[in-house]
Every structure is written in structure tokens, then in C-alpha cells.
């Protein structure tokens, strides 16, 4: 993934997740820690929530991270498609390093493996988009 993607994502901490499960479409904002090495988000979410249930039923998910601005010339945002996965020790370590106070809440953590991402950055020119495609991935 190109450095500009990481620069943008390092400046934010909330993604908007979209899922599709037996209850239909749903979306939710989630705090994220960014695993740059594995090109993944690490998020906390209760397994009973509608969006987590949807992701467990259909692990292909989508989402976005956006800069809120009223200036068209400053618009920046990332759209992504990914795979919802269980957490692992590396993900736990990263999440609690990013959000140390969350440890006391004993959250259930998940990983989102980014398969495809599109970064819009109007500072580079109106409608300028950069794309990332993961070559190898696993469900």
C-alpha cells in the first residue's frame, strides 16, 4: 500500500463499517488501530451487535474513513473492501497500544484485512484517486 494511504489513515481513528447479514444492511462507526505491516484495521465490537452479526454471517465487508470538511479542495476519504477476521495476539497488542484505556473494558477485538482501497485526495487535484489491491488474501 502506498505511503499516502498510511499518512491519511494515521490521522484518523474512526472507520464506518458496512455489513450485510440475515437482518439486512447495517453500518456502524468503530475506533480502529492500523496494522501497517499486515494492511489491516483492528477494531473492537461486541459479537451481539447487528453489524458484528452481519460480518460473521458474511465476512466480506465494506467501509470508509473520511475527513469532515466543507471545502471541496480539501476533501479526503478512503473507501475499502475487506474480510472480517478474528483477532490474534498481535492485533490485541496493537489495539491496546493505540487505545490503552480500552483494556479495562475487556473488548472483543476483530481484524479487517483490507482487500481493496480507494483514496480520494482533492489536495492532489480535483477528484484525484489512488487505489490499492491486495494480491493474495484468505477467507
Swiss-Prot record:
Disulfide bonds: none
InterPro entries reported in the protein's UniProt record: Split_barrel_FMN-bd, UPF0306
Family of the protein in this entry: Belongs to the UPF0306 family.
Protein name, entry field: UPF0306 protein WS0399
Organism: Wolinella succinogenes (strain ATCC 29543 / DSM 1740 / CCUG 13145 / JCM 31913 / LMG 7466 / NCTC 11488 / FDC 602W) (Vibrio succinogenes)
Lineage: Bacteria, Pseudomonadati, Campylobacterota, Epsilonproteobacteria, Campylobacterales
Amino acid at each position: 500500500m502506498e505511503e499516502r494511504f498510511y499518512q491519511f489513515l494515521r490521522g484518523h481513528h474512526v472507520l464506518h463499517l458496512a455489513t450485510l447479514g440475515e437482518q439486512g444492511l447495517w453500518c456502524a462507526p468503530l475506533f480502529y488501530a492500523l496494522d501497517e505491516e499486515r494492511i489491516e484495521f483492528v477494531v473492537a465490537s461486541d459479537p451481539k451487535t447487528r453489524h458484528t452479526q452481519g460480518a460473521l454471517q458474511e465476512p466480506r465487508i465494506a467501509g470508509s474513513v473520511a475527513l469532515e470538511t466543507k471545502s471541496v479542495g480539501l476533501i479526503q476519504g478512503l473507501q475499502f473492501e475487506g474480510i472480517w477476521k478474528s483477532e490474534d495476539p498481535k492485533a490485541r497488542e496493537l489495539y491496546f497500544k493505540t487505545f490503552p484505556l480500552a483494556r479495562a473494558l475487556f473488548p472483543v477485538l476483530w481484524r479487517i484485512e483490507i482487500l481493496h482501497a480507494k483514496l480520494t485526495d482533492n489536495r492532489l487535484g480535483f477528484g484525484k484517486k489512488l487505489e490499492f489491491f491486495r494480491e493474495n488474501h484468505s477467507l
